[in-house]
Amino acid sequence: MLYRNRFLVLLALAGLLAFLSLSLQFFHLIPVSTTKNGGSSKSRKRIMPDPVTEPPTVDPVYEALLYCNIPSVAEHSMEGHAPHHYKLVSVHVFIRHGDRYPLYAIPKTKRPEIDCTLVASRKPYHPKLEAFVGHMLKGSGASFESPLGSLPLYPNHPLCEMGELTQTGVVQHLQNGQLLRDIYLRKHKLLPNNWSSDQLYLETTGKSRTLQSGLALLYGFLPEFDWKKVYFKHQPSALFCSGSCYCPLRNQYLEKEQRRQYLLRLKNSDLERTYGEMAKIVDIPTKQLRAANPIDSMLCHFCHNVSFPCSRSGCLGMEHFKVIKTHQIEDERERHEKLLYFGYSLLGAHPILNQTVNRMQRAALGWRDELFTLYSAHDVTLSPILSALGLLEARFPRFAARLVFELWQDRQKPSEHSVRILYNGADVTFHTSFCHDFHKHSPKPMCPLENLVRFVKRDMFVALDGSSTNYYDACHGEGA
């Protein structure tokens, strides 16, 4: 018996040591055997970098991995967190579409072979993927605002079409929807079980990738939803400016911002040399390569762990990718410093922020319609909103990025309402320009709705030039 007990103790110790060894290897605290070129000793054709913690300096590969937003374990999020005496009243969600096939092809190279059919046996996978496809097949008679009715409800091409949503993109938004369901429906009961169509507001641009992303999130949020209760409105503008899109001053800011981008590119000799090398490899003029926006296609290769394209003269490589990605990061940094993009953002984001504030005010008055709002959009939609809110440290919108506005009511003081702003699950409320110092001089744990209302109705115009008091005057004034 004594020997048996000793054996069991030794066996337990051996198991513990094995677990510690694997854990240390996973967190890169002890070395793993590598080949001469630094790769894993296992033979692999393609290597996907896997940083565990954020590097101390800006790393283009790490930033690119964050941008890919590859589905993995359930993420930690702060949506739905509030003191117990607060009641959730309404939620307004802005998303960027999920992972997509490139919008541009690099001339004289083979397109990346990405399958855009939805297959349960292929990674990334989601438990609701097959059910999602089955439900989409039942939606052929869905009534959406024109021209959305002519778009496919899910991606289904063996070789993706340009700009098409991939299986990764669908899974990203199924995850988003399920996360929001767990928080807002199961925990906070935002919608009743017999919810009605007027309690949802759904809007998307006319691209299949945004409609399909919206449907994937909606299915994760409301599995097996009734098609008769779902109506997507079409938004012609990526800024979601509806009837307020004409804004001359906004266009002036954009032109000057594009000029700034051009001048920064000219100053980057590393970037120009890299474009020259890449153009020589694919045997086209440098100007033609630059116009093809090669980083768009290379990001698809990178996110899907597919080798970069080659020609008879060689291959585009990771060093080329790093140089272009590093320039993108530098461009974002300078963009925030020069403030031209900030002026563009204030005017570009005002219509959609004004709509959101109006909905929140109605909900605060007790209206029970449009309790859950979803805008399925693009990076060029979310980026101006983030900038206008003063979230200068926010990363550029990744695939399937989500920006959430929550409206809360204080049960102890029912006339008082508060807002929370969350970006990819992080609470950024007290980083916004309208609430960044509120907690310094107030004991209240939440940011008052009035702060956001005042910001949208007045302070956004003050930040532009101080003389305008409404959107029309600001758009037709002088300032850029």
Curated annotation (Swiss-Prot):
One of its GO terms (molecular function) is phosphatase activity. It holds the Pfam family His_Phos_2. It is an enzyme of class 3 (hydrolase). InterPro entries: His_Pase_clade-2, His_PPase_superfam, Histidine_acid_phosphatase. Residues 28-480 are lumenal. It catalyses: 3-O-[beta-D-GlcA-(1->3)-beta-D-Gal-(1->3)-beta-D-Gal-(1->4)-beta-D-2-O-P-Xyl]-L-seryl-[protein] + H2O = 3-O-(beta-D-GlcA-(1->3)-beta-D-Gal-(1->3)-beta-D-Gal-(1->4)-beta-D-Xyl)-L-seryl-[protein] + phosphate. The chain crosses the membrane at residues 7-27. Residues 1-6 are cytoplasmic. It is a single-pass type II membrane protein. Keywords: Glycoprotein, Golgi apparatus, Hydrolase, Membrane, Signal-anchor, Transmembrane, Transmembrane helix. One of its GO terms (cellular component) is Golgi membrane. One of its GO terms (biological process) is glycosaminoglycan biosynthetic process. The active site is at residues 97, 379. Glycans are attached at residues 194, 305, 354. Interacts with B3GAT3; the interaction increases the 2-phosphoxylose phosphatase activity of PXYLP1 during completion of linkage region formation in a B3GAT3-mediated manner. Responsible for the 2-O-dephosphorylation of xylose in the glycosaminoglycan-protein linkage region of proteoglycans thereby regulating the amount of mature glycosaminoglycan (GAG) chains. Sulfated glycosaminoglycans (GAGs), including heparan sulfate and chondroitin sulfate, are synthesized on the so-called common GAG-protein linkage region (GlcUAbeta1-3Galbeta1-3Galbeta1-4Xylbeta1-O-Ser) of core proteins, which is formed by the stepwise addition of monosaccharide residues by the respective specific glycosyltransferases. Belongs to the histidine acid phosphatase family. This is 2-phosphoxylose phosphatase 1. It comes from Rattus norvegicus. The gene is Pxylp1.
